[in-house]
Design a protein with these regions (language model features):
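Alpha-helical transmembrane segments within multi-pass membrane transporters and channels
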Residues: 1-2, 143-151, 187
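Alpha-helical membrane-inserting segments
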Residues: 14-22, 65-66, 70, 93, ...
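Functional transmembrane core segments of multi-pass inner-membrane proteins
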Residues: 28-36, 40-140, 183-187
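N-terminal transmembrane signal-anchor/hairpin module of polytopic inner-membrane proteins
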Residues: 1-25, 182-187
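Interfacial loop-to-transmembrane junctions
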Residues: 111-113, 146-172
Length: 187
């Protein structure tokens, strides 16, 4: 089916980009495995509205391992305490949204898979990445959902998989996070 072609094409493009962008083999291997896990999560959540724990835990394990590999400090936070704080802040930021939504609406909203995914992003980039990643993900989700809502193709009660937006926001942070923060600090 077309979905398999798209996944394989994106995996190939991602691997090529990683291979051409980094010269440290530790970085290349780590980033390729992370990219593959994120790609699986993205498509599983799009299709089934779930994020398998095994994939989220894989990200967290890789995020912890990266603290002990050489020459990764330019890409990710390499301070184990910042990494741990990032995981906790990432998880709690989504957990708080889930909790408040349930208290206000009296029903389930997001799942804890999104919280675990955000924990993995926090473990990778540190706590300081969480506000920007969450903002970008929310903005992307809103921009994608608005046309369907305005055309009344979807209602406010429609399910929206959030992992693709968290993953995209994490990628934006990975590529442009420092630039975005410099722009924000100037403003």
């Amino acid at each position: 089916p077309l979905q398999y072609f798209i996944i394989e094409f994106l995996a190939g493009l991602g691997f090529l980009f990683i291979f051409l962008s980094f010269d440290n083999y530790y970085s290349i291997i780590l980033l390729m495995v992370l990219f593959l896990i994120y790609l699986m999560i993205l498509f599983i959540d799009l299709k089934h509205f779930i994020i398998p724990d095994i994939l989220n835990y894989g990200i967290i394990v890789l995020a912890i391992i990266k603290n002990f590999l050489p020459n990764l400090d330019l890409i990710f936070t390499q301070d184990i305490m910042l990494s741990l704080a990032g995981g906790i802040v990432g998880y709690l930021s989504i957990w708080l949204i889930i909790y408040l939504y349930k208290q206000i609406r009296k029903k389930e909203g997001m799942g804890l898979g999104d919280a675990k995914l955000m924990a993995g992003i926090g473990f990778l980039f540190g706590w300081q990445s969480i506000p920007l990643v969450l903002f970008i993900a929310s903005l992307l989700a809103l921009l994608v959902a608005m046309p369907s809502l305005m055309a009344k193709k979807k209602g406010l009660k429609s399910k929206i998989p959030f992992a693709p937006y968290l993953i995209t926001a994490g990628l934006v942070y990975f590529l442009y996070g420092n630039v975005i923060y410099k722009i924000v600090l100037v403003i």
